[in-house]
Amino acid sequence: LASKEDVQYILDQANRVLEPKLRADEIIGVYAGLRPLVANNKSATTTKLSREHTVDRPAAGFVSIAGGKYTTYRVMAKDVVDRAVIELRRLTQESVTEKLPLIGADGYFALEQQKERIAQESGLDVETVKHLLNRYGALISEILEIIEEQPKLATKLGADLPYIKAEIVYATSHEGARSVDDVISRRTRLSFEAVNHGVHLADEVAALI
């Protein structure tokens, strides 16, 4: 959980450029986490440590990675695989992740140009279609199939959120979610985007899974 000092630090930084200024009583939710940084004996504070990752071979047949961040996960994976390939004496090929589109990426731009048609045919509003395209890309077709089978799942999950109920069903039927926490914290961004980490949505989510 974020401390008061964490919250005040963010407010101070944001208020350097925002007008009107943000106030602590306007915050609807906070979170904090630990970043796995690579130690550096020359640095006395974590704020000056590099966010880069490092790949190591601490023992024969064992490749490890430390540091890094969410946004560089594909580069991290590539570096680990490529190092493992060396260990395997090139019995397999190096990583090809940079050539592989993310799931749902193929056809995304064509569908984005057709969002009005998709909205008209599905009965959804255009903003919801844009939300679904940004979350699922070309896999939006699987969400639309769920709605076609159960039209009531096209309704919103909370008036102030972009999510629809079909996404909760999809999380369990297609993405392996097994609990309310799986859905709120992992398959969606409700724990970040909803007030109080989405706790007030728990009963509604539970009824859908």
Describe the residue ranges of each PLM region:
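C-terminal accessory subdomains/tails of enzymes that are appended
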Residues: 1-209
